[in-house]
Amino acid sequence: MDVSEGGVTVSVPTASGGGEGAADDVFFNATQELNRDLTVATLAAFREREPRAASYLDAMTASGIRGVRAANAGWDVTMADVDADAVELATSNLARNGLDGEVVARDANSLLHDHDRVLDVVDIDPFGSPMPFADAAFANARNLVCVTATDTAPLCGAHFESGVRKYSATPRNTNYHAEMGLRILLGALARTAARYDVGVTPILSHVSDHYVRTYLELDHRATDANAAVEQVGHVYHCQQCLSRDHEYGLVAAPRAECPRCGGHQVLTAGPLWLGPAHEEAFAASVREQLTREMGEASQAFHLLQTIEGELHEPTHYDQHRLYSQWGEPAVGMAEFLDQLRDAGLRASRTHFGGTTFKTDGGLAEVEAAVL
């Protein structure tokens, strides 16, 4: 069947039930249109930031729709897949749109280690964890690595042992599980890049539906790698009163008791990324690159607008969860945030949920401001 998206039309597999999906081992995910719209807009914004960036690798291309859209936006595209049917389909989709590009039947790691190729932007969008491809990406990409992770249960700690194995970290299943997953992923990626003397800067990150997506700008100096590793640390979360604090460093110092309530159910999470997960100005520039032909432009616009205003403090709170903990009825979010600001705290909404917020104050300060 044919799908039109972002100014291109491609053939995609038809699942056995007649819908869009997987057939003959070639996968197409219609629900990832937001992800692809944001990818194209991010590539456009990044090219303004780094005009020399020209080449783009869609490392797990499947139907090729992401790579075709990148080629349509003017990128020198290479599309790769280990499946011969996917390579044939992606090649056909490039041709039917009158676009140039190369489609190769190669494993992503093998292709990335081919030093005859210069790849400015590498896009890793596997099914599951991206970590098996992270070393090759950071060792060989020049400017930008784009990463999707769909294994959100291991990342957020719901599948604890799997998260420990895949990300060499301790993820904890908290009421801010989406941000936990994002920061566990960023921490693992930063540590991987540092092995190759590459420093990463997250210029845009988001958690949408059941995936985590981040765009990491690269700097190829050991000092930059050191600086990125310095943004990694641990979060200490009290299961009883929901307070938490954090500290930088790869060595954890577990808390015997909560400094706020004196409870002894304090979880240690990490190593994870404690630094900013986005740059406000870059998020704004991505928003400016959204076009009417993008099917999820409206959702992308509002997502980016929220991210622009989101504070960088690690870990958000859920307002409804706090009021439930306090045994009080929740007020409206706008009123709630105004109360925090009136008390001298910085506060913002977050893109992690409609009742989530960030603040530079501790939980005791939040409680004093609103109760």
From Swiss-Prot:
Residue positions binding Zn(2+): C238, C241, C258, C261
Gene3D superfamilies, A to Z: N2,N2-dimethylguanosine tRNA methyltransferase, C-terminal domain, Vaccinia Virus protein VP39
A GO MF term: tRNA (guanine(26)-N2)-dimethyltransferase activity
Signal peptide interval: none
UniProtKB keywords: Metal-binding, Methyltransferase, RNA-binding, S-adenosyl-L-methionine, Transferase, tRNA processing, tRNA-binding, Zinc
Enzyme class, UniProt record, top EC level: transferase
Top-rank taxon, per record: Archaea
HAMAP family: tRNA_dimethyltr_TRM1
Protein's name in the database: tRNA (guanine(26)-N(2))-dimethyltransferase
Species, as recorded: Halobacterium salinarum (strain ATCC 700922 / JCM 11081 / NRC-1) (Halobacterium halobium)
